[in-house]
A protein has these predicted regions:
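Ligand-binding "clamshell"
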Residues: 130-141, 280-282, 296-300
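Ligand/substrate-recognition segments at binding pockets and active sites
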Residues: 76, 220-292
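Ligand-site clamp/hinge motif
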Residues: 85-131, 248
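Short, well-ordered beta-strand elements
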Residues: 24-25, 67-70, 80-81, 96-102, ...
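Periplasmic-binding protein-like
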Residues: 155, 159-197, 242-245
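Surface-exposed binding/hinge segments that line
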Residues: 6-50
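Structural transition elements
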Residues: 188-221, 237-245
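Gly/Pro-rich hinge or "lid" segments in bacterial periplasmic/extracellular proteins
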Residues: 21, 40-93, 97, 213
Length: 300
């Protein structure tokens, strides 16, 4: 039905055989531990062959399933509506319909919740958590495999030099971002694998310390004093709890050691359109977040 951007999740498959009505055999070209979790991920869910044949390339906009709700409407950047499935195998849902609204800006989500415009929201900006402490709200917190990181353009510009990349890492006060921007709801990353993957996490790793003097020394060694950096930041989006505040804090830290940083902000989909193809010829760095189902997938 069209290009599948996450096809690499299943690139190890060499054959699929039907054993009986309830059994399928997958043969892989090598051992691949995340395969079962990938099948349980949304990208691995079973779809209706009839629906694929009927809708073709439009199948993604006409989802079909066996859940408690059935697809009703999809208006881009506005809403997705699902209605109660009267034929659900496990009885009917308790509500007639559910409306999903893509409110990428965290402050907008908060305002809508406080005004009664929505009944449920995810990714509450940490600075807004206190607004939902009253008995009329229920807040659920969960630790997850979520990583916020910077994409550095190492192919050209200042960050093509390893010393300049290291300088940026020393220059950014990550503890301050965790405490002041994310209100203590995160931890400083020591590597790309989050602590939520306890079995795959190396507790012996230490993050780069905050050392602006070391950063300045590396910049001087690289001859990059006053280097101009273009920094792409999204206004909000999937996994982005407070991206502008985080980007502004990063900008201030980098400028404190001698960089000249210019932030360019984008709406989420426009941001992805700029960042996903690569930063070459456009920017030196970009803010990004990722949540994954196993420690082997992107961005690792």
């Amino acid at each position: 039905t069209g290009p599948f951007p996450l096809s690499f999740l299943f690139s190890a498959i060499t054959s699929v055989d039907v054993i009986d009505d309830l059994t399928v055999k997958f043969t892989l070209n090598a051992s691949y531990a995340p395969f079962l979790s990938n099948l349980a991920y949304p990208t691995g869910l079973i779809v209706s062959p009839d629906a694929v044949m009927k809708h073709g390339k439009d199948f993604g906009r006409n989802p079909s399933g066996t859940g408690a709700f059935q697809f009703n409407e999809w208006k881009s950047n506005e809403r997705v509506v699902v209605t109660r499935n009267a034929d659900h195998w496990d009885g009917q849902a308790g509500v007639d319909a559910v409306i999903f609204r893509p409110l990428t800006d965290g402050n907008t989500r908060v305002a809508e919740m406080l005004a009664g415009g929505i009944d449920l929201m995810v990714e509450v900006p940490p600075t807004s958590l206190s607004e939902f402490s009253g008995s009329e709200f229920s807040v659920v917190e969960q630790a997850g495999p979520h990583v916020w990181f910077l994409i550095l353009n190492a192919k050209e510009g200042p960050f093509a030099d390893k010393k300049v990349r290291q300088a940026a890492n020393y220059a950014i006060n990550k503890e301050a971002i965790v405490n002041d921007v994310l209100e203590g709801t995160a931890a400083v990353a020591a590597g790309p694998t989050p602590p939520a993957f306890a079995w795959a996490y190396n507790n012996d790793l230490e993050p780069y310390p905050y050392d602006p003097d070391k950063a300045k020394a590396l910049i001087a060694e690289a001859g990059a004093e006053g280097a101009e950096l273009t920094f792409f930041v999204t206004e909000g989006g999937s996994g982005m709890l407070d991206p502008v505040a985080m980007g502004t804090a990063i900008q201030a830290d980098l400028e404190a050691v001698g960089f000249d940083v210019k932030i360019e902000t984008y709406e989420w989909n426009s941001f992805l359109g700029e960042v996903n193809p690569g930063l070459e010829g456009k920017a030196d760095m970009a803010e990004m977040a990722w949540m994954t189902n196993d420690p082997d997938t992107l961005p690792f």
